[in-house]
């Protein structure tokens, strides 16, 4: 995984800079997501990407055919990635592209895991506090995990804020056993 991320980063940066310079971030984002979905498919990976009998150009051509209508510049980008034998890194490239796009747009996806369903007012209050703290636009996804017993866990990028009862009990147990 670390190797894939290392390989993906410069490709994602190049794709991002091209898309930003040509004011096509949204288009590239959607089309890269489509290509990512195809490349990450287990059947496609087993039959095409990991098939040693196919050349890099054949693999790339099959990927582009399955993806359907893509911008010509994105097709050229995928051909470049494929010609270097890096199609397996395409999902990681797409993910890195989205990280760069979110940073550029000062936006972050936040996952709120709570013990119980949150109403709209509670979600808005959390979103406002996070927007102020992170200085970013916030997109919220909520999930319920009854095992938390109470409170919430907030995940925003690399930042995790654990305000759950389960988390507090775990920290208390660790402090007492130290």
UniProtKB/Swiss-Prot annotation:
Cited SUPFAM superfamilies: N-terminal domain of the delta subunit of the F1F0-ATP synthase
Is this entry keyworded Ion transport?
yes
Q: Name one Pfam family in it.
A: OSCP
Question: How does this protein sit in the membrane?
Answer: Peripheral membrane protein
- Principal subcellular localization: membrane
Q: Where in or outside the cell is it found?
A: Cell inner membrane
A GO cellular component term found in this entry reads: proton-transporting ATP synthase complex
Question: What does the function comment of this entry state?
Answer: F(1)F(0) ATP synthase produces ATP from ADP in the presence of a proton or sodium gradient. F-type ATPases consist of two structural domains, F(1) containing the extramembraneous catalytic core and F(0) containing the membrane proton channel, linked together by a central stalk and a peripheral stalk. During catalysis, ATP synthesis in the catalytic domain of F(1) is coupled via a rotary mechanism of the central stalk subunits to proton translocation. This protein is part of the stalk that links CF(0) to CF(1). It either transmits conformational changes from CF(0) to CF(1) or is implicated in proton conduction.
Name listed for the protein in its UniProt record: ATP synthase subunit delta
